[in-house]
Amino acid sequence: ELSGTVETAFIGGWHRNAKYVELRADGIRRVMTERGLDAQDPDVCLYFSAHGTPISYLEEGSQYQEHVEESCRLIADAVAVDRYELGYQNHTNRTKVEWTEPSNQDLMPTLEADDVVVVPVSFVHEQSETLDELDLELRELVEQLGMGFHRVATPHDHPDMGAVLADLVIDALNASAGAPLAHVGASS
């Protein structure tokens, strides 16, 4: 049984953190170097895959799509890539829900590239939506289309990820110095 309260603070917009953007860019550069790919080659497509979200959430004020698009732009800029694509991993089994577009399944066949470097932009750790939906399902589609599939890992085990998260917390604490944080009480 828990009792008491916990002070909390919301840390938003951390996709803009320069160190976070750089470690995401580092992952892309690493894959491109290992695979002998050139980010400036027009036959190489930098492809961001984001978790889809219902349009109704966006209509209710969620900034998710804006943040994903901004994150892609910042990371692409850090890699010095002008051309990139963004597709969404939508839950196609939920047909009564309108999802963010374009879906990976719709966008991928339209690409004109020999190689696709896939970045799971809205994921910070590996899970079924990266390991299954990207590594198995999307890879199969990409290879059926005759393109090379190159997946960038999520940053969960990047040596700088812990420091990025610590900096975000420290910055939030410093910003709230003297200001009350929100209180979350445990129910008894």
What residue spans do the PLM features occupy?
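Extended amphipathic ligand-handling, pore-lining, and cofactor/metal-binding catalytic surfaces
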Residues: E1-S188
